[in-house]
């Protein structure tokens, strides 16, 4: 009986994935860049892009939100042997963003797609006119065969006004783009009852339909391993996206062909909103 229920749940989630008209795929720093060297993981990125191309081939649209600029540019500051100051992180982001986009562009080009870089700030996503302009830009890029690849403009953002992590940026992009599904690729399989690194008996939560105080406590027990975000920020992102009527998946992204893995039933946590359109859908 339990196996039958599991198969039914998997089939339902697969349908949601295959039927999503527009998807946002967020890629964490720990997934796209080597944690020690900051080098872009080119072979892995190629498998992700092959997944993205396959989605486009069956009539779906994909918008990418990527972290990794600071990681890719930080090797210029290795001699400091300490945590980077704000201005150093901004410089690292400016250097690394170019490397990051070149890697994406080269991989997309091999499959006949262009790339459209979009750098957003908190002011952009908080302003209705900017949101509408961004939505129009996303659509025009998709119309001409260019995949929007989005990052926060870390080179100019300050702690007072920055979004702070790309999980919430991805959720706001999902609002703006009227996406049906937000996929958060991370260094963990999903939401656990406790931190699985500390407690091997921790259980993964396969599905969340309402973010309760208990769910928030679970998220607080799952700290980030790398990057600026953790499970708490992913839960924040899930709440934002669910309020816009968008399904959310948290899954481990470090494996090759990470989107195909989700499609084939790899461990993940799905956040499923009520089956209705909400007033906030579209970020208006």
Swiss-Prot record:
Chief subcellular site?
cytoplasm
Q: What EC numbers are recorded for this enzyme?
A: 2.7.2.11
Please cite one Gene Ontology biological process associated with this protein.
L-proline biosynthetic process
Q: Which reaction does it catalyse?
A: L-glutamate + ATP = L-glutamyl 5-phosphate + ADP
Q: Which CDD domains match?
A: AAK_G5K_ProB
In its UniProt record, a GO molecular function of this protein is: glutamate 5-kinase activity
| Binding positions (substrate) | 67, 154, 166
Query: Which positions are annotated as binding ATP?
Result: 26, 186-187, 228-234
- The cysteines joined by S-S bonds are none
Annotated Pfam families: AA_kinase (PF00696)
Instruction: Note whether Nucleotide-binding occurs among the keywords.
Output: yes
Annotated Gene Ontology cellular component terms? cytosol
The record's annotation in InterPro entries points to: AceGlu_kinase-like_sf, Asp/Glu/Uridylate_kinase, G5K_ProB, Glu/AcGlu_kinase, Glu_5kinase, Glu_5kinase/COase_Synthase, Glutamate_5-kinase_CS
Q: Which Gene3D superfamilies match?
A: Acetylglutamate kinase-like
UniProt KW keywords: Amino-acid biosynthesis, ATP-binding, Cytoplasm, Kinase, Nucleotide-binding, Proline biosynthesis, Transferase
Q: What does this protein do?
A: Catalyzes the transfer of a phosphate group to glutamate to form L-glutamate 5-phosphate.
Say which family it is in: Belongs to the glutamate 5-kinase family.
- HAMAP family membership: ProB (MF_00456)
Q: What is this protein called?
A: Glutamate 5-kinase 2
Q: Which organism is it from?
A: Mesorhizobium japonicum (strain LMG 29417 / CECT 9101 / MAFF 303099) (Mesorhizobium loti (strain MAFF 303099))
User: Which gene carries the instructions for this protein?
Assistant: proB2
């Amino acid at each position: 009986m339990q196996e039958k229920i599991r198969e039914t749940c998997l089939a339902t989630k697969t349908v949601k994935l295959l039927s999503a008209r527009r998807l946002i795929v967020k890629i964490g720093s720990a997934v796209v860049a080597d944690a020690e060297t900051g080098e872009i993981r080119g072979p892995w990125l190629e498998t992700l892009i092959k997944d993205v191309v396959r989605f486009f081939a069956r009539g779906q649209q994909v918008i990418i939100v990527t972290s990794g600029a600071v990681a890719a540019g930080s090797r210029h500051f290795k001699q400091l042997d300490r945590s980077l100051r704000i201005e150093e992180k901004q410089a690292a982001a400016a250097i690394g963003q170019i490397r990051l986009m070149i890697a994406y562009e080269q991989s997309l080009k091999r499959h006949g797609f262009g790339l459209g870089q979009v750098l957003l700030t908190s002011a952009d996503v908080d302003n209705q006119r900017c949101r509408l302009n961004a939505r129009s830009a996303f659509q025009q890029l998709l119309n001409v065969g260019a995949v929007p690849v989005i990052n926060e403009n870390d080179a100019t953002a300050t702690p007072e006004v920055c979004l702070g992590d790309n999980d919430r940026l991805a959720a706001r992009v999902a609002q703006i783009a009227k996406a049906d599904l937000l996929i958060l690729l991370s260094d963990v399989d999903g939401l656990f009852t406790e931190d699985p690194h500390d407690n091997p008996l921790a259980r993964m939560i396969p599905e969340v339909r309402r973010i309760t105080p208990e769910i928030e406590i679970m998220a607080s027990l799952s700290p980030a391993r790398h990057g600026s975000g953790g499970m708490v920020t992913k839960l924040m992102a899930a709440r934002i996206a669910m309020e816009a009527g968008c399904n959310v998946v948290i899954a481990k992204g470090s494996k090759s062909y990470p989107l195909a893995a989700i499609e084939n039933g790899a461990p993940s946590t799905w956040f499923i909103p009520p089956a209705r359109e909400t007033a906030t859908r579209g970020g208006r």
